[in-house]
Amino acid sequence: MATSIEQQAKGKKDGEIRYLTPLNIETTKAKKYCRFKRSGIKYIDYKDPDFLMGFVNEQGKLLPRRLTGTSLKFQRKVATAVKRARHLALMPYVGDLLK
């Protein structure tokens, strides 16, 4: 009886123990690219609040680079554009109006 369990664990018989085989987990994630570099945008217009709303969450906070995929250079430009749009009342500071 003990030999049949060992043979099953080694996979010599028809019975195969599944929890001994490694799981196939896909670890490759799609690489995020900066949409500004890809499309060749050099200037981010602060007068276009609909475009800037893509970089702001429901609470009105700026989304981080790791979520949007923008480069550091363009993340700074997005931040200044959002701040200018908020200052000129083109965008709300608080996200209550975003819903």
From Swiss-Prot:
Organism field: Christiangramia forsetii (strain DSM 17595 / CGMCC 1.15422 / KT0803) (Gramella forsetii)
GO cellular component: cytosolic small ribosomal subunit
Gene Ontology biological process terms from the UniProt entry: translation
Keywords, sorted A to Z: Ribonucleoprotein, Ribosomal protein, RNA-binding, rRNA-binding
Function comment: Binds as a heterodimer with protein bS6 to the central domain of the 16S rRNA, where it helps stabilize the platform of the 30S subunit.
Protein name: Small ribosomal subunit protein bS18
Subunit comment: Part of the 30S ribosomal subunit. Forms a tight heterodimer with protein bS6.
Family under the similarity heading: Belongs to the bacterial ribosomal protein bS18 family.
InterPro entries: Ribosomal_bS18, Ribosomal_bS18_CS, Ribosomal_bS18_sf
GO terms for MF: small ribosomal subunit rRNA binding; structural constituent of ribosome
